[in-house]
Amino acid sequence: MDEQISKAVEIALSGTSDLVLKNQAFEFINQIKSTEEGYKSCLDILLKSINSNSPLNQEFKFFILQVIDENITKLNNEQLYELNSDLFQYLNYVINSNINDPVYLKNKFAGIMGNLFCFTYLSINPTFLKDLLALIADNNLIAIDIYSRIIIAVHTEISDKFISRSREVQDRNNLLKDQIRTNDMNLLVDNWQKILRNPELIQHNNEVLNNFLKIIGYYINWMEITLFISNDFINIIFQYLNKPDQRNETCLTLIEVISKKMKPLNKLELISLLNLTSIINSINNDDDLEFMENIAKLSNQVGLELVIVLESSELELFDSINQQFLNLWPSIFKFLSHEYDDISQQIFPFIQQYLLTCKKFNQLASIELLSSLLNKIILKMKFDDDDDGTDDESTEQFNEVRLKLKTFQDTIAILKPELFLEAIPIVINESIFANVSDFDKVNWRNLELGLFELNTFTESLRNNLINLPKQEIGNSKPYVLVQEFLIKLINSDVVLKVDHPKIQLGFFELIVRHYNFLNTNINNQEVILRILELFSSPLGLFNNSEKVRLRTWYLFFRFVKLTKPTLNNSSFIENLFIKLQPLLVIKAELPTKDEDNDTVENGNFNNQLNLFESIGLLISLLSVDISLKVRMIDLIFQPLFNDLENCISNKDKVNQQLIALQAHHSLMAIGTFARGYDYDYNNKYSAEIVGKINNASQVVLITLENFAKFEIIRDAARFSFARFIPILNEEINNHLSKLVSIILAANNLKISELTNFLNFLGQIVHNFQSNDNIYKLLNDLLSPLLDKIFSLLKYNGENNEYESMPDIIRDKESLKKSYMNFISAIITNHSSSLLITETNKQKFPIILESFFVYAYNTSEPTVSKLAITQLINVVSVMGGHGGKINDPQDKYGESLPPLEGVDEYLMNKAVQLSFELPFQKSEFDLKDAQYRLVGQEIASLLKTYQEKRGDEYLTFLSNYLTNMGLSSELMTDFCTNLVKVDQRAFKKYFITFVTELKGK
């Protein structure tokens, strides 16, 4: 067996073994791990290696230890006793033979001993720790090394606070700790102190020394602290702060020491006794960044512990605690000012807690202290001199730090508004405007800091951090000061002269974010023109940096949309639009593939659309003669029309995809321009403007006719028409029929495309519900549209492959929802008669049947609920009226003949659905929120029918419930509630009714 196990491990670890053989080896290995026979065999192999003095190879030994470790929890007390004896025998062998295994083997063995300790110390081997101490009595380095690892492993098992444990295990661990305190604590601590005091005993081995420092930090958490904090012991630990190889671990140990839970007075005495603030202030090892980071962590923990003491102590301790704070702040300031952010961030938690505590203890918030802190924070928020601000990753990291610093600054603003209002304007003024007469002296980092602080200062007013009465904010001195800063900045050339992306983007972001401060300016028109001029300069829309340029295109759109400037300077406007012409030239680029073979779209065009939308909005808002508006529209549209004409006439068959993409982009630009023009919904569009959009719709249709086989063209055409509707209104009638017929006739219409098309048609129904021409269009369209919908929903691919394709399943679910929402749009917009005209009445039973089919489909609860909603809509307009439409606002409803039998069909099927769905579908669980919503919708259906049909419905329902086997008492109660309570109350009743019946 020994040889089999050894061979199996060798094969499993081999990189060249036959795959079949390797799988067999793994199967055998797993069997060894999981059986008692395998465990015993591995333990025997380990013991034989001792007796024969023939060491195992390292990989095989690790496997043996792994098997032993994984089986400890399965052993009975007798087996645990034997294992305890065997492992101590093995440990003796390792020590006496001076076997220095690799670290991973030593740690694995230590982990086994730590695990074994938990099962043996209480009753099987109470001398476990004394036995360990006996092994290191002669100061053998290998023995002390393994001993330290076992002690750490015991900590991991019984008190590591980062490991989640069951209540049972935690109770056991508490008993283990109690027994250690009683039997072994003093011996252990004396031993640790001895080793740390005499590092020569372990030949100054750095790893072992660090292990013992860790042990102090681990065990002090639950041992008696007085054993550790005698002057002698503390001085021993402190001396390691001067040893390069131990000082980092020493910092972490001291953090654990001061973190021990204690009464406030005792904790304060401990901090005073350790005198850590003086020690920290005396350390200056800037060259060792890791050490400085750990010292900063230690400073931070001292501060946090003082905060905890203050918040949980009596007021008479305040002066002593405050003195400790004052002693600590020099080191906090030193670390906050450190050039490396990783070091500075270590003291952020303390700063945050201190500032929050200042809200409770005003005495802490001295002007002198907070002023110094604010100055340090501001300086830290500036880009470092060696950072050129162009690396995205480092900028992101810096912004994370800056965001935390801003939080501190905001808290200071709340604590001491007068300090904030005095300091920040000085920073803004000196950073932005100090060298306006000599731009060569302007450092972009200073300017960027000024822009950032101007932004934060403005936000502080918006959020009223300085606690002004709301009605006074707009007239307050800080508010006026912000306006002055913004106007001064806009009129200054400083951002034009400092060529840096951070300045350019920072400026435009600032202006857009705080546009409302400009809207109240008395010279608003002049300021707006200046901003538009800056946007259209090389600083913004024409910037050489693509990142700045594309972002500015979006910011330009946001600015125009937010401010809605009403411009009346004709020459400025005309020059502006002519200047922007080069940016409106569209050049399509086909998607490319990245290294992972994923499709990468060219993002420039989507950014370019922001310009078209901005210009559309600007033209719509012009306070000028209509002829100028028309000329501006021509200036935008004509190049697009020419481009589309070129696409249509281009017969290059090789580049059809690129040509279609070019046409798509031009159509999207036209539609997006129209969307911008429509932002002012109160606009009364003149005949000239309507004429221009009408021309555009004709161009769109011509393009669609020529590229009808391309989905992207159909999408773009639909997009454009959706944006034309508010402007053209009923003028669009002339074009819609053609648009719809071309799209529906497409042979390659996708499910997702039809889904979007139905949403578009729903918009048409809503906008033109009283338009006779649109009614006729929809009447002619409805039946073929329904055929298309049901055809796509039914088709599952040539070999039913769609049934297992999540994307197709999801698309079909979306199509069902859009189809039902379209029917809902017809009914709720008083056009229900469309469903039963002579043209469409043959489809109406199919529509109703689809609603019932979808309602019963519990695998799609959202679809089921929506289907029931549509049944409620149908019942509302047709239930109880002999198949006639009952909607006074449906002007064609009265003239149509009734549909025979629809009442009986609806009532019968609706009642069946209402009880079969919740009671016969096992997966219908009302504890599930989605099914609960379906149940509530069923209740609404029942209530709606009762309100429509009254006693006739109750009679039908009573007969159905009787046949279903419901008792007369329950049936009476159900019908009484159905009649007497409102819909909301009946929903609750129905849910309870179903829940209780299903529970019986």
From Swiss-Prot:
InterPro entries: ARM-like, ARM-type_fold, Exportin-1/Importin-b-like, Exportin-T_C, XPOT. Keywords: Cytoplasm, Nucleus, RNA-binding, Transport, tRNA processing, tRNA-binding. GO terms for cellular component: cytoplasm; nuclear matrix; nuclear pore. Signal peptide: none annotated. One of its GO terms (molecular function) is small GTPase binding. The keyword tRNA-binding applies. One of its GO terms (biological process) is tRNA processing. It is found in: Nucleus; Cytoplasm. It comes from the Eukaryota. tRNA nucleus export receptor which facilitates tRNA translocation across the nuclear pore complex. Involved in pre-tRNA splicing, probably by affecting the interaction of pre-tRNA with splicing endonuclease. Belongs to the exportin family. This is Exportin-T. The gene is LOS1.
